[in-house]
């Protein structure tokens, strides 16, 4: 937070609110919908949901690995790290925002992330991400790491998540 752990809203935030309203209105007038994902330096408050569809969960590195599982496979350490960050936000800090409105950088399967999964591990990783119930998944993928099987797995998991979102979102 700011001084004395207090947050405040400034002219900058009012400007963003005006922009959110304007672009949403312009799309509505064109008969189109719009997804607004609020990503930088935002307070994770449900108050923002009157203007945006999702809010970035800014409480961790883009990718990380749990330290307490040092003898476990990389996949398990990555899933546990991210689950720990969600637990910290939603349980320890008791953020009052439904998880489906949170956005995070995941899934990440790219060269810069230094992860390498078998097809089976990749599938498990994607299902763990999907089961968290977010409405927005940004796919951080390096196409050079993908093979035909991984592309099929990705398609299968995305379709499964869409088909089950009415359950997963809660």
Place the predicted regions along the sequence by residue:
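Short acidic catalytic loops
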Residues: 1-6
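Generic detector of multi-pass transmembrane helix bundles and their immediately adjacent loops
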Residues: 7-11
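Active-site-proximal substrate-binding groove within the catalytic cores of carbohydrate-active enzymes
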Residues: 12-170
